[in-house]
Amino acid sequence: MAGAKEIRSKIASVQNTQKITKAMEMVAASKMRKTQERMASSRPYAETMRKVIGHLALGNLEYKHSYLDERDVKRVGYLVVATDRGLAGGLNINLFKKLLADMKEWNGKGVETELALIGSKAVSFFNSVGSKVVAQVTGMGDNPMLSELIGPVKVMLQAYDEGRLDKLYIVSNKFVNTMSQVPQILQILPLPPAEEADLKIKSWDYLYEPDPKTLLDTLLRRYVESQVYQGVVENLASEQAARMVAMKAATDNGGSLIKELQLVYNKARQTSITQELTEIVSGAAAV
């Protein structure tokens, strides 16, 4: 059994670690509230944009944009949104597992895949497994700007425009609540039709100002940008929630470990005292 001094040192070490995890939990909780506000403010725009695009996909358009046409699928692209920092539980690895399963399914059909990565955890993971990475951005911080995301988005849109990609997906975590974050893979291009039943039974038509091509070229790029930005802010909220939960679990586990070490320490002290008393009694008897 370890000595009492060694056990006291372990208890002090766990207590110091517990203070750190508690502080990180509180910081994550504060950041989560801020990111939730940002996510909530951008979500209506992204959802409305998605509905408008759904209408367009079902409509009788004067100008047929290439983003609306289904193609024979030979190569698929993914915009992957992960975190820059760790200590977020299984948030990233669950997302990566879901993506790898989807990529394996496409590869089984003879379809190639390539990735544009947002977040250092995605960069390190997919480079280590040998995936084809065509663009990457890291160091987004806690307040990501759309201008910082444009690089990977432009690379994938250019590949789609030139016919080097036939489908484009965004891969990120959807924030449900503090305890639940769901990895999801959403199709961006070609534009998915609206899913609502009442929209499918209607025939949509539009009048354009100034002209269909100018309007659709701008609108469809704004749509892609809005979906990527929303994916980033939702993933950021998911990151802070997962980190808060992970740090709380670590703090609670630290408390349990301290109790166990305290019990071991008490037993060690008891053994030491008993041994000292025995030695005193033995010495007295010898005299």
UniProtKB/Swiss-Prot annotation:
* GO molecular-function terms, A-Z: ATP binding; proton-transporting ATP synthase activity, rotational mechanism
* Gene Ontology biological-process entries: proton motive force-driven plasma membrane ATP synthesis
Keywords of this entry: ATP synthesis, Cell inner membrane, Cell membrane, CF(1), Hydrogen ion transport, Ion transport, Membrane, Transport
Its placement in the membrane is given as: Peripheral membrane protein
* Stored InterPro entries: ATP_synth_F1_ATPase_gsu, ATP_synth_F1_gsu, ATP_synth_F1_gsu_CS
Q: Name one GO cellular component term.
A: proton-transporting ATP synthase complex
Disulfide connectivity for this sequence is: none
Q: Which domain of life is it from?
A: Bacteria
Q: Where in the cell is it found?
A: Cell inner membrane
Q: How does it assemble?
A: F-type ATPases have 2 components, CF(1) - the catalytic core - and CF(0) - the membrane proton channel. CF(1) has five subunits: alpha(3), beta(3), gamma(1), delta(1), epsilon(1). CF(0) has three main subunits: a, b and c.
Similarity comment: family membership:
Belongs to the ATPase gamma chain family.
Report the function annotation for this chain.
Produces ATP from ADP in the presence of a proton gradient across the membrane. The gamma chain is believed to be important in regulating ATPase activity and the flow of protons through the CF(0) complex.
The protein, known as: ATP synthase gamma chain
Originating species:
Sodalis glossinidius (strain morsitans)
